[in-house]
Regions:
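Charge-dense, helix-prone N-terminal extensions
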Residues: 1-117
Length: 118
């Protein structure tokens, strides 16, 4: 088994995924008016029917345990270029300026900052 395969298997571990999901849930639910619903099989958080965070656990076997969220206009390429191990362009919503954030690469404080900006 090559290193990339090992990395993907380790990252999609259910226990690790659940721990990250709890982190994200705690931050998202601290937002006034936040609601959690399942969307495409994953927890997604809304404020006034607007999505602001999507949880993604190994979406289409991509190896990421991440959140996808919108960023201020023009920030997506800057974040990805500056911190390529932390940020990536997610499928579907990346074209709209959203980023994926690798949850094992970001502190709770930094994650909360990005979620609050979303």
């Amino acid at each position: 088994m090559n290193e990339e395969t090992k990395r993907m298997l380790a990252k999609t571990n259910t226990q690790e995924s659940e721990e990250h999901k709890r982190r994200v849930r705690r931050i998202c639910m601290s937002m006034p008016g936040s609601e959690e619903k399942l969307s495409h099989g994953e927890p997604t958080w809304f404020v006034r029917k607007r999505v602001f965070v999507m949880f993604a656990n190994n979406h289409h076997n991509d190896g990421h345990i991440a959140v996808w969220l919108p960023t201020p206009q023009g920030m997506q390429p800057i974040l990805i270029a500056s911190f390529p191990k932390t940020f990536f362009r997610p499928p579907y919503v990346g074209i709209k300026g959203w980023v994926g954030i690798e949850l094992d690469q970001v502190s709770d404080d930094d994650l909360a900052l990005h979620i609050h900006e979303a």
